[in-house]
A protein has these predicted regions:
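Structured, hydrophobic secondary-structure cores that serve as assembly/anchoring elements
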Residues: 3-43, 47-50, 56, 91-313
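Short linear motifs in intrinsically disordered/low-complexity regions
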Residues: 2, 57, 68, 76-78, ...
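Charged, low-complexity intrinsically disordered boundary/linker segments
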Residues: 43, 62-71
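A short, well-structured beta->alpha microelement
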Residues: 67-94
Length: 313
């Protein structure tokens, strides 16, 4: 068309540049629209990816993944998914052989209300599973503290000791500035934390510079002062902190705030639950043996030997 229009070379160059700019702008708009459309899916995939990355394992054994939206996991009126997960946990715990029982339940994102969290907490407590989930994605630590206080999520009920709640969302990827995206993609930190918990010795909390560092994470939603970290830890949250050039968890609290200090620390709760399940499994295997003084001594001896082998220094 330009050649047939008898235009000069300079006019043709200018026209080509205008068309190229228009096409480039249209491409950027369409790419940005595509990014916005798949954002929730991208969040989900990146969240699962960070769980795997933080296990530091080439292959993970004994894992089950449920494809469910947050709406399905918080709907108490139509509790199909909640019941299905509860049945799966119960089927592997309410039995004689406990080798296939679950120990971690990861629910990335904010469950939204105290009644929903209590529903999940009771399921976890009944099956001796530790839940890792998240608080709301907010922009400032003061907002987190205020909203958490108003939500009344922590409490003295024993089942609250089976829930850990992280805050300060992770930067899953930086924003695409060339496309006009204005904000980084933030993802819930509970999956990355649970991945680190998966690889760490059960009695050791996954927190601090040495044990709490998150792999392949560059940043967090907001920076935290030492006083703010202390306040978040005090109210029962697990804040993600960027210091020393890395992102780390800086608390080991559960949502339990009763008098029993042990139940406020998730490593203690997990060890208690594990020891209970080991002893239950052991005694199930010794059921209906003839009972005499020799059998009693043998049983007591094996239990004492096991408990001695796992005691601290």
């Amino acid at each position: 068309d330009m050649l047939q229009g008898n235009k000069s070379i300079s006019e043709m160059i200018e026209l080509c540049q205008k068309k190229s700019a228009a096409v480039s702008d249209l491409l950027s708009q369409n790419q940005l629209k595509a990014v916005e459309e798949v954002k929730q899916l991208e969040k989900s995939y990146r969240t699962v990816m960070l769980f795997y990355k933080n296990t530091d394992s080439d292959k993970i054994k004994n894992i089950s993944i449920v494809n469910a939206s947050m709406e399905q996991l918080t709907d108490l009126d139509n509790s199909f998914f909640i019941d299905a997960i509860a049945d799966e946990l119960r089927a592997n715990y309410d039995r004689l052989d406990l080798r296939t029982n679950y120990s971690l339940l990861v629910i990335p994102g904010y469950l939204g209300s105290n009644k929903v969290i209590e529903k999940w907490a009771k399921i976890a407590h009944d099956n001796k599973v530790m839940i890792y989930t998240d608080f709301a994605d907010l922009e400032k630590p003061d907002d987190v503290i205020e909203m958490f206080f108003d939500s009344n999520l922590s409490g003295g009920d024993v089942y609250k000791s089976n829930v850990c709640m992280a805050c300060n969302y992770l930067v899953g990827r930086g924003r695409y500035a060339e496309l006009g995206e204005t904000e980084d993609l933030l993802i819930p930190p509970s999956a990355a934390l649970a991945g680190s918990v998966y690889k760490t010795v059960m009695a050791q909390v996954t927190a601090g510079k040495k044990y709490g560092s998150m792999s392949e994470v560059d940043g967090v939603a907001f920076n935290l002062k030492k006083s703010e970290i202390s306040e978040l830890e005090k109210i029962g949250l697990i804040p993600m902190v960027k210091e020393y050039g890395k992102v780390m968890a800086f608390s080991a609290k559960t949502l339990f705030n009763g008098d029993n200090l042990g139940l406020q620390t998730y490593s203690v709760v997990r060890v208690f639950d594990w020891v209970t399940k080991v002893l239950m499994d052991f005694l199930n295997r010794r059921a209906f043996e003839n009972w005499n003084s020799k059998a009693e001594r043998d049983l007591r001896g094996q239990i004492s030997k096991f408990l001695d082998s796992i005691q601290g220094p």
